[in-house]
């Protein structure tokens, strides 16, 4: 029987998934959503935890922003299509620099896994900046902030129990996880950062659609609890923040990853 506090996904698959490929990612420390090593370590980097999602009072909740990059950064591509239309080809940084684009107009994504994060106002960084290029010159751009939620406490015992599972092995006894969710950080850090970044972006003549915020739906609902009723949806302009929220899809058989399901699409002036 599953505990009320439990780990849901580790290295992209169900925590208890005993299929061969899922267990190989445990050995490699690999993240299937960004195609490289997981960045969730213990304090001395001797253990790679790979924890993508965990239980919460609001249902299964994404706790690593890289989990939101499933299906080859589909959430980022969705922003590009909304901001610049679906006709302009989309390139990650390595794709753009690796060969000349076939189109005179294209979108290039710059971020932590595609080139580097872009600095904002000298002291802040934006997770992603999508740049619309025409004849290799910048004509417009939008910023994207991607957030999940930090955890408190620890899930060490539960994680090590799941780690004992091997390919094809029988189920093992899993202790309850001792994690909590750092909702206070939403109020103290995330909201002020979004306000500051939105203000900086609104001042640029090359920003015509403000910035975008990608976040798990339960985290956004917590924003609403803290801030009250959000303004009515508005058409996008340079002062606008557009919010896309996502939930994890239904649990899948072992060997398959869960889909991300779009939930909210809000836009209001920041």
Question: What does each model-identified segment do?
Answer:
Residues 1-35, 39-41, 166-270:
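Non-catalytic C-terminal interaction segments of nucleic acid-processing enzymes
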Residues 124, 131, 146-147, 213-218:
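Short His-Asn-centered micro-motif
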